[in-house]
Amino acid sequence: MPRRREVPKREVLPDPKFGNVDVAKFMNMLMLSGKKSVAERIVYGAFEQIQTKGGKDPLEVFTVALNNVKPVVEVKSRRVGGANYQVPVEVRPSRRMALAMRWLREAAKKRSEKSMALRLAGELSEAAEGRGGAMKKRDEVHRMAEANRAFSHFRF
């Protein structure tokens, strides 16, 4: 591990339309090759779709979806006496958010709708209702942690 001082976390400015930091972080995660305007168009397009199709507040749907997808526990490999054990550990809050956003992005990419905005809208709506690819991923991680609960005494 490096022995230098800890690098400070960078402040993320809230997004221009909703004034929400989480939306801005999600846009930054979605962005490819520094094209923020494209990422903005995708996210705001998805929010528009949620508004028109569901008639719900898109920001609320986004927040509920994120909270539903956030993992509580995950497994980490730990070597003990020549054997590797999958040890369940609690996920710290910043990593929870990052994983939830990453899983939402990946699940949206795998969907079959025409545009990324439509895919993202579908995934966010489904995640808010407790189903979809991102929720499946979260449940899979929780299942792994539950299956390896016997090794929880090998805490890090």
Curated annotation (Swiss-Prot):
Cellular compartments per GO CC: small ribosomal subunit
GO annotation, biological process: translation
Record Pfam families: Ribosomal_S7 (PF00177)
Keyword field: Ribonucleoprotein, Ribosomal protein, RNA-binding, rRNA-binding, tRNA-binding
InterPro entries linked to this entry: Ribosomal_uS7 (IPR000235), Ribosomal_uS7_bac/org-type (IPR005717), Ribosomal_uS7_CS (IPR020606), Ribosomal_uS7_dom (IPR023798), Ribosomal_uS7_dom_sf (IPR036823)
GO molecular function: rRNA binding; structural constituent of ribosome; tRNA binding
The UniProt record lists the keyword RNA-binding: yes
Transmembrane domains' residue ranges: none
UniProt-recorded name of the protein: Small ribosomal subunit protein uS7
